[in-house]
């Protein structure tokens, strides 16, 4: 039996990953992390979606220790989430240092326990928000370290790594879940479901990608299939 663990926030990217994983694996487990995030409404959204989509199990882990250590606008109400700035340089204040290091490591421990062969995460390098822990180089390095440390070949899969946000919408549509992802996920840094606040970087990436996809579905769908190998 093929099993996988999906790092699941209830946002566009991880929900699309879950939808695909349910088609590719016999048994899919979800793991969501409560780190005292500003947009913690995502936890309830993740619970609802994991149940609705048919995950075998859904575990919510308390990692509020991260909130104490990592200062970010996503972990401190006193630090405002900035509006999207297309020319912004450097790492944004929404970056939570160590978040994906912790999440992927804990997800791998969970995968070890449930005998899953893969940990799936929705990180993306193509149009990422400037986060160093979304890079392919980082994921591969951590995967190698975790496999060595556990003496077990647990594979980190990043199905969205080389597709852009428009193509991520196309992937959801490919599996017949475009409307679900559009209306029932929570991507917004300010914790607003669906189309979100419309001002933060997460909402901007999501909205621009959707508009691009809807404006030229055939071309974007073809590009997504070429990059992912889907027929």
UniProtKB/Swiss-Prot annotation:
Statement: the UniProt record of this protein carries the keyword Ligase: yes
Keywords from the named record: ATP-binding, Ligase, Metal-binding, Nucleotide-binding, Queuosine biosynthesis, Zinc
Free-text cofactor note: Binds 1 zinc ion per subunit.
Keyword ATP-binding in record: yes
Enzyme Commission code(s) on record: 6.3.4.20
Catalytic activity of the protein: 7-carboxy-7-deazaguanine + NH4(+) + ATP = 7-cyano-7-deazaguanine + ADP + phosphate + H2O + H(+)
InterPro entries in the record: QueC (IPR018317), Rossmann-like_a/b/a_fold (IPR014729)
UniProt GO MF annotations: ATP binding; ligase activity, forming carbon-nitrogen bonds; zinc ion binding
Binding site for ATP: 8-18
Cofactor(s) for this UniProt protein: Zn(2+)
Pfam families for the chain: QueC (PF06508)
Superkingdom per UniProt: Bacteria
GO BP field: queuosine biosynthetic process
Known role: Catalyzes the ATP-dependent conversion of 7-carboxy-7-deazaguanine (CDG) to 7-cyano-7-deazaguanine (preQ(0)).
Family, as annotated: Belongs to the QueC family.
Listed name of the protein: 7-cyano-7-deazaguanine synthase
């Amino acid at each position: 039996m093929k099993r996988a663990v999906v790092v699941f926030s209830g946002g566009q990217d991880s929900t699309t990953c879950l939808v695909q994983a349910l088609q590719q694996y016999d048994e899919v487990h979800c793991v969501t992390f409560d780190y005292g995030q500003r947009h913690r409404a995502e936890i309830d959204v993740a619970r609802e979606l994991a149940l609705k989509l048919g995950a075998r199990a859904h575990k919510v882990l308390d990692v509020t220790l991260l909130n104490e250590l990592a200062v970010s606008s996503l972990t401190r109400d006193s630090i405002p989430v900035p509006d999207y700035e297309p020319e912004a340089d450097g790492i944004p204040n929404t970056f939570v240092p160590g978040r994906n290091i912790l999440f992927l490591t804990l997800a791998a421990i969970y995968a070890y326990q449930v005998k899953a062969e893969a940990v799936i995460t929705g990180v993306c390098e193509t149009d990422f928000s400037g986060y160093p822990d979304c890079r392919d180089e980082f994921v591969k390095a951590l995967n190698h370290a975790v496999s060595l440390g556990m003496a077990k070949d647990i594979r980190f899969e990043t199905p969205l790594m080389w597709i852009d946000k428009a193509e991520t919408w196309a992937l959801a549509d490919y599996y017949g879940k475009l409307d679900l992802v559009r209306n029932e996920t929570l991507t917004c840094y300010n914790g607003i479901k669906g189309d979100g606040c419309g001002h933060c970087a997460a909402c901007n990436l999501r909205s621009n990608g959707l508009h691009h996809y809807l404006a030229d579905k055939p071309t974007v769908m073809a590009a997504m299939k070429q990059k992912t190998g889907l027929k």
